């Protein structure tokens, strides 16, 4: 019997599917789903509680309420399976069919589906080419629409009001046909011949020139084509049959007290059925038109509410005044089907508890409370008890476990042995938020966590809770052990550095044991090895910090097994010698023979991992932790109030500052400085005073004097507890110590501005009431900020994950030669990020040639590991071309070589690695550490912004990039080109420093000259832009008429007069069209040409310029003719932190963005309009010039006649990434976004590898717009997936046809997520209704390529171990297909099931 049931069950196993298609349902299809028509609005009988016949819960339509039992009770039990009761008409089967059987309602009149009507752009409106307003008026019975115009002068689709309709009737009689309501729209949709219409529109498109019209036509053609391709019929957007959800999905549950809780859908369905039945009755009675119309309108509204309540008009509310939840609300939003149930399922076999420290654990262990383990592993225990014969049945085993017999604990030990569990701490911001451990049973009720994994979890023990999950199957356990075990996750996937790093106590302990002390007990002793040194310390013969000599044996790794041995006597301390005992063979002694802070310990672990591999590193990390805890306890570090020593100079410094402030106050009152300057100066004074106090304090804290062996006084690093904690990096920082023992300093108001009275007290002295009040200001803002930040950061992560979720490594090599050029990041005089850091773990895109020779140093496609990076440094190579995901040629996914090293493992990335999600997590996870605020520039900052010279830090050679210069009359070099870069190179020609030099700067040294450090190489005036002559000659004024275009001003102090150009707004009507300029002529009055061109040398002057020369005087090249004052833009806010990162990834166009040159050519200015000037760029080959209107208030960087290259900055401002992509290409936009994002993270000290940002950029660039389709299948102006264009163009060029011409688009991450090929992924992200409407009309097919789609349909994801599974599945699919082709036709499914049921019935 059991076997038979098994056979029966195996019959209904679902087939593997490859894709999911969404389309419009035709009325016949809806009827085919249905098991019967619902005719009555009744639900259940109030006395018997049985469902009413033909009602919304009818058992005849939807199936029996109880398993294998008909409604009237005539047939019960399994043996009547499949019988239909002749009395109540119910089929005897399982009651779960009530979850899958649907019903339907035959509507008395067609009804428009609100999604296709109101979800913008309205599909019905687009198809009929009618405005939405008009369609609505027809649908809701306000106007008529002409369905058939006949022989009249009316037009089809024309809207007539009641009055116009009556007039037309009088005039034409029944020549024409006009209707209202959904039936009219249905007739119109029915009458469209899609193919004909489509061809007609294509012809129109080819003949029309207006941009807006073309856009509209393209939209309609796309819609029509999608209907043709998908075999959807337009009239299916109008419902004639309404499907009804299975009743168990909209349940009616009895509550105690005789009341019922019901799903809102039942109310909505009831309204529909009531109105539909009433309408049927009215139609049978042939009631007056106006009544029928009203009923039809009400039915339309009822169905609108059922499908999407509140989309049109007021939402229908229930008895308790809240809007009813419609079908659309069921699937959208955070509580909808997608995000609540499909992507966020709850997990069985899990528990949670508070965490506490387990300092004695090994790295791969965690402490699990016995009580929890017993509950979590129950089924395993039952199984074991039964298998061993200790319990006869499961019930008996259950009793034993409940009684907690002693044998149960032994069994639990066996079960748990080598069965990993997963520990998760919410919020899981990156993949290290879930790791696997082997459980160790402990008493108590708290989970014990290994201290070293706290950093990965971001956990602390102040009441954090964690969840435990049990992997059940063998495969799951194997996966947890091999991939998720904490010992396999030593490196952070974000930057490839160890994340298992000691912190706090451990760091303090190691720091303490590696410190030196002058004249400590046992100084100068010599030991034969570390063991002896430790013994001496334990016996009390010497102190931990004593400087001694120890014989040390170092091992250097040659290959996997062999080491090179080297023994020598080293000067060290006892503590370091003890620490050397736990260091694994293969690491050099110098790494331990120094004071170890947090950074050095991290470096030690990193080196250990790179040289000795995983196993040694894990053991070493554990040993470090035990040793650290041990010696931290012995150090006895504690915080006492006397440890916070206040510097003696403090009061003097503060009183000096107060005197300075009062001086400034006096100047302000006598009117010498403005209020703003006073405020900035006061703040600067206090900031400087605070610096001085804290310097004095740190000097005081960090050193102490002691007597050495010779009896002389000597300074040594202090053993002050607070200083040691900060110095080792265990806890606290100089800034915090400053508040304890220096002065608290300046505080900010909640709006970010600084309060000018600082808090001069520190926490040791205590604050008075005013000081306390001021400090609460900032503190509250901090708390509010944190709350906001968490939400914003979470949303950013969600968008990033969504845009990148389908990127997986799918092949080894795409063989592309493209790549990005890597150089070190240098700003001013300091290297922000070296080439080594940037290139590590990348694959070279071209051979790297040895400098000054033609030998190949590193071949193409080499993975640059630490060894190769040393080679790069040795040959001082400063720029290389490496592969990048942005340029990867793989169609779906990325190849391993373009990605490079898997940062968390340290080798080339494996196929199936979900790099998209990892990138998103790496960028999103530190989001909460970024600031939320925008910075206000003021005080010290604003002065730094206006530098006026370049002083070099290193000696070297000067290199000028794209510099044009002239020599002025004083023999100095003046720069006359824009965006000049000045670099300082060392003797290997490596860039050491890099500066931007503005137009008009005076340079002290020429290209390729030597400079010494500290030399000033360039100077300029930061407040004005000069106009510099490039030729010699005489000045001639053009259009400079006193009172009309210029005015003369006399300076009161010097008595000199100067000519000032009037702004257009200040000129008289006569002077409006004048264009003042300085022209340079030779002695005969002829134009002088700019060298190398045929442009006369004349300089147009913008308003407010100050002219520095007079008419017809002689000038020589390099002289300043005029100065344009720079408007000090006041305090411009810089968007920083999280909002800046979000702006970059959303590719938002900044306000007042930089204007870039669209083409290369010469600049000239045309006729101005009221508020704008006309900029004209004439290309070098005199083709059609490019014109642009620019607002007058924009400061331009270019003068008439200047040459610009495509993409040069014409007017300063923040650059728009879209412009950079259009004018400078993919490479430039990649570089721009990476640098800008890294800038924000660098400020917070967060390290993220560039390749993660590149992964997101690749996803932002995945669409392109077709400019000219040529022979391809695309439309002009259509936006298409870039990979599709690539594939299509490859195929076209193979057969020798013209390929499509396209331009790449940059989409923000939200847009890119919604524009993904997969509609399931897009619908579950945002705007569910719109996505589903669009996809169903187009009959979209989801190939289930991404991770999200597969999670939603409940399959393994195509990444990691699931990647192999899907590959295998596809192989088998193809095999089966070929088999089926060759297989002779066999018995049909129907016959088989008939035979089976016969067999079953005979045996029962």
UniProtKB/Swiss-Prot annotation:
Q: Which InterPro entries match?
A: DNA-dir_RpoC_beta_prime, DNA-dir_RpoC_beta_prime_bact, RNA_pol_asu, RNA_pol_N, RNA_pol_Rpb1_1, RNA_pol_Rpb1_3, RNA_pol_Rpb1_3_sf, RNA_pol_Rpb1_4
Question: Record's superkingdom?
Answer: Bacteria
Cofactor needs: Mg(2+); Zn(2+)
Residues the entry annotates as binding Zn(2+) 2? 814, 888, 895, 898
Recorded GO CC terms: DNA-directed RNA polymerase complex
Query: What is catalysed by this protein?
Result: RNA(n) + a ribonucleoside 5'-triphosphate = RNA(n+1) + diphosphate
In this chain, Zn(2+) 1 is annotated as bound at 70, 72, 85, 88
Q: Which EC class does it fall in?
A: transferase
Molecular function terms from GO: DNA binding; DNA-directed RNA polymerase activity; magnesium ion binding; zinc ion binding
User: Which keywords fit this entry according to its UniProt record?
Assistant: DNA-directed RNA polymerase, Magnesium, Metal-binding, Nucleotidyltransferase, Transcription, Transferase, Zinc
Which EC number applies?
2.7.7.6
Q: Where does Mg(2+) bind?
A: 460, 462, 464
Q: How is the cofactor bound?
A: Binds 1 Mg(2+) ion per subunit. Binds 2 Zn(2+) ions per subunit.
Q: Which family does it belong to?
A: Belongs to the RNA polymerase beta' chain family.
Q: What does the record give as the function of this protein?
A: DNA-dependent RNA polymerase catalyzes the transcription of DNA into RNA using the four ribonucleoside triphosphates as substrates.
Can you state the subunit structure given in the record?
Answer: The RNAP catalytic core consists of 2 alpha, 1 beta, 1 beta' and 1 omega subunit. When a sigma factor is associated with the core the holoenzyme is formed, which can initiate transcription.
NCBIfam families attached to this UniProt entry: rpoC_TIGR
Record's protein name: DNA-directed RNA polymerase subunit beta'
């Amino acid at each position: 019997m059991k076997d038979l049931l098994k056979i029966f069950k195996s019959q209904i196993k679902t087939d593997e599917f490859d894709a999911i298609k969404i389309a419009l349902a035709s009325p016949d299809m809806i009827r085919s789903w249905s098991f019967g028509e619902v005719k009555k609005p009744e639900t259940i009988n109030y006395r018997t509680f049985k469902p009413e016949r033909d009602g919304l819960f009818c058992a005849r339509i939807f199936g029996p309420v109880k398993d294998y039992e008909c409604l009237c009770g005539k047939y019960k039990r399994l043996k009547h399976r499949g019988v239909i009761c002749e009395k109540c008409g119910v089929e005897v089967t399982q009651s779960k069919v009530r979850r899958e059987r649907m019903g339907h309602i035959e509507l008395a009149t067609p009804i428009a589906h609100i999604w296709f009507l109101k979800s913008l752009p309205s599909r019905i409106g687009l198809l009929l080419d009618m405005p939405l307003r008009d369609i609505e008026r027809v649908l809701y019975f306000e106007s008529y629409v002409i369905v058939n115009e006949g022989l009249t002068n009316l037009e089809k689709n024309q809207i007539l009001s009641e009055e116009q309709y009556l007039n037309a009737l009088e005039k034409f009689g029944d020549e024409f046909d006009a209707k209202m309501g959904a039936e009219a729209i249905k007739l119109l949709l029915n009458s469209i011949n899609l193919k004909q219409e489509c061809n007609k529109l294509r012809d129109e498109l080819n003949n029309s020139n207006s941009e807006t019209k073309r856009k509209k036509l393209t939209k309609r053609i796309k819609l029509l084509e999608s209907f043709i391709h998908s075999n959807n019929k337009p009239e299916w957007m109008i419902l004639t049959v309404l499907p009804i959800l299975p009743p168990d999905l909209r349940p009616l549950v009895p509550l105690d007290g005789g009341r019922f809780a019901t799903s809102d859908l039942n109310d909505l369905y009831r309204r529909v059925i009531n109105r539909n039945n009433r309408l049927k009755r009215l139609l049978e009675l042939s009631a007056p038109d106006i009544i029928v119309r009203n009923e039809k309108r009400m039915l339309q509204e009822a169905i609108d509410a059922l499908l999407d309540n509140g989309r049109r008009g007021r939402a229908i509310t229930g008895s308790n005044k809240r809007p009813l939840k419609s079908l659309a609300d069921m699937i959208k939003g955070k509580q909808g089907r997608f995000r609540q149930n499909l992507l966020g399922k709850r997990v069985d076999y899990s528990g949670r508890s508070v965490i506490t420290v387990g300092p004695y654990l090994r790295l791969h262990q965690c402490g699990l409370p016995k009580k929890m383990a017993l509950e979590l592993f129950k089924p395993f225990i039952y199984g074991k008890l039964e298998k061993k014969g200790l319990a006869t049945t499961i019930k008996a085993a259950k009793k034993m476990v409940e009684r907690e017999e002693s044998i149960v604990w032994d069994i639990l030990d066996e079960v748990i042995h080598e069965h990993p569990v997963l520990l998760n701490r919410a919020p899981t911001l990156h993949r290290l938020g879930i790791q696997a451990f082997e459980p160790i049973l402990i008493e108590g009720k708290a989970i014990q966590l290994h201290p070293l994994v706290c950093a990965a979890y971001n956990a602390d023990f102040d009441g954090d809770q964690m969840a435990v999950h049990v992997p059940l199957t063998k495969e799951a356990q194997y996966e947890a052990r091999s991939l998720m075990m904490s010992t396999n996750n030593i490196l952070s996937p974000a930057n490839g550095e160890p994340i298992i790093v000691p912190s706090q106590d451990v760091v303090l302990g190691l720091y303490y044991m590696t410190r030196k002390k002058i004249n400590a007990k046992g100084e100068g002793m010599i030991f034969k090895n570390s063991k002896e040194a430790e013994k001496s310390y334990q016996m009390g013969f010497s102190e931990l910090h004593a400087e001694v000599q120890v014989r040390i044996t170092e091992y250097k790794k040659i290959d996997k097994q062999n080491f090179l041995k080297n023994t020598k006597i080293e000067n060290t301390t006892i503590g370091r010698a003890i620490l050397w005992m736990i260091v694994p063979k293969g690491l050099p002694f110098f790494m331990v023979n120094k004071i170890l802070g947090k950074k050095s310990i991290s470096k030690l672990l990193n080196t250990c991992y790179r040289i000795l591999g995983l196993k040694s590193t894990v053991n070493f990390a554990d040993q470090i932790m035990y040793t650290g805890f041990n010696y931290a306890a012995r150090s006895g570090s504690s915080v006492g109030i006397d440890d916070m020593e206040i510097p003696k100079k403090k009061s003097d410094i503060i009183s000096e500052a107060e005197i300075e402030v009062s001086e400034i106050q006096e100047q302000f009152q006598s009117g010498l400085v403005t209020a703003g300057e006073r405020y900035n100066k006061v703040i600067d004074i206090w900031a400087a005073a605070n610096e001085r106090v804290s310097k004095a304090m740190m000097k005081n804290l960090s050193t102490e004097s002691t007597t050495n062996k010779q009896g002389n006084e000597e300074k040594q690093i202090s053993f002050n507890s607070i200083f040691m904690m900060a110095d080792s990096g265990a806890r606290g920082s100089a800034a915090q110590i400053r508040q304890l023992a220096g002065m608290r300093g300046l505080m900010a108001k909640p709006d970010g501005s600084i309060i000018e009275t600082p808090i001069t007290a520190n926490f040791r002295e205590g604050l008075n009431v005013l000081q306390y009040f001021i400090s609460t200001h900032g503190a509250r803002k901090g708390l509010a900020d944190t709350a906001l930040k968490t939400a914003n950061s979470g949303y950013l992560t969600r968008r990033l994950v969504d845009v990148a979720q389908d990127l997986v490594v799918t092949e080894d090599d795409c063989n592309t030669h493209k790549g990005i050029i890597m150089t070190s990041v240098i700003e001013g005089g300091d290297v922000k990020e070296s080439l080594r850091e940037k290139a590590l773990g990348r694959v070279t895109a071209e051979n790297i040639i040895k400098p000054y020779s033609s030998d190949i140093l590193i071949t193409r496609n080499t993975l640059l590991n630490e060894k190769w990076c040393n080679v790069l440094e040795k040959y001082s190579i400063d720029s290389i071309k490496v592969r990048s995901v942005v340029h990867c040629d793989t169609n779906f996914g990325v190849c391993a070589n373009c990605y490079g090293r898997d940062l968390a493992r340290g080798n080339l990335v494996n196929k199936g690695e979900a790099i998209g999600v990892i990138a998103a997590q790496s960028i999103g996870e530190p989001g909460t550490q970024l600031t939320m605020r925008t910075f206000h520039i003021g005080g010290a900052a604003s002065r730094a912004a206006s530098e006026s010279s370049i002083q070099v830090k290193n000696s070297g050679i000067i290199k000028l990039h794209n510099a044009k210069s002239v020599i002025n009359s004083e023999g100095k070099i003046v720069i006359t080109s824009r965006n000049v870069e000045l670099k300082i190179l060392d003797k290997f020609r490596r860039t050491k420093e890099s500066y931007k030099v503005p137009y008009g700067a005076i340079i002290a040294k020429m290209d390729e000259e030597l400079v010494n450090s500290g030399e000033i190489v360039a100077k300029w005036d930061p407040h004005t832009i000069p106009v510099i002559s490039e030729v010699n000659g005489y000045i001639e004024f053009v259009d400079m008429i006193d009172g009309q275009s210029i005015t003369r001003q006399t300076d009161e102090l010097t008595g000199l007069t100067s000519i000032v150009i009037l702004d257009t707004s200040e000129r008289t009507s006569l002077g409006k069209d004048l264009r003042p300029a300085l022209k340079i002529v030779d002695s005969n009055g002829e134009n002088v040409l700019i060298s190398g061109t045929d442009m006369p040398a004349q300089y147009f002057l913008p308003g407010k310029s100050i002219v520095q020369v007079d008419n017809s005087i002689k000038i020589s090249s390099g002289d300043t003719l005029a100065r344009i004052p720079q408007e000090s833009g006041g305090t411009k806010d810089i968007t920083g932190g999280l909002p800046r990162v979000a702006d970059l990834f959303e590719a938002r166009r900044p306000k007042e963005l930089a204007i870039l040159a669209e083409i290369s050519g010469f600049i000239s200015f045309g006729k101005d309009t009221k508020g704008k000037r006309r900029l004209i760029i004439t290309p070098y080959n005199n083709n059609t010039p490019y014109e642009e209107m620019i607002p007058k208030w924009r400061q331009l960087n270019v003068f008439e006649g200047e040459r610009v290259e495509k993409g040069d900055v014409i007017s300063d401002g923040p650059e728009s990434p879209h412009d950079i992509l259009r004018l400078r290409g993919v490479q430039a936009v990649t570089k721009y976004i990476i640098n800008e994002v890294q800038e924000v993270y660098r400020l917070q000290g967060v390290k993220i590898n560039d390749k993660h940002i590149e992964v997101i950029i690749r996803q932002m660039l995945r669409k392109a717009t077709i400019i000219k389709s040529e022979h391809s299948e695309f439309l002009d102006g259509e936006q298409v997936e870039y990979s599709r264009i690539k594939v299509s163009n490859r195929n076209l060029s193979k057969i020798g046809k013209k390929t499509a011409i396209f331009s790449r688009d940059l989409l923000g991450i939200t847009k890119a997520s919604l524009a993904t090929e997969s509609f399931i992924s897009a619908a579950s992200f945002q705007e569910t209704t719109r996505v589903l409407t669009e996809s169903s009309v187009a009959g979209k097919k989801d190939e289930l390529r991404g991770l999200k789609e597969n999670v939603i349909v409940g399959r393994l994801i195509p990444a990691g171990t699931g990647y192999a599974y899907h590959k295998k599945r596809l192989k088998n699919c193809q095999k089966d297909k070929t088999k089926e082709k060759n297989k002779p036709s066999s018995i049909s499914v129907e016959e088989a099931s008939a035979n089976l049921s016969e067999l079953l019935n005979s045996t029962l």
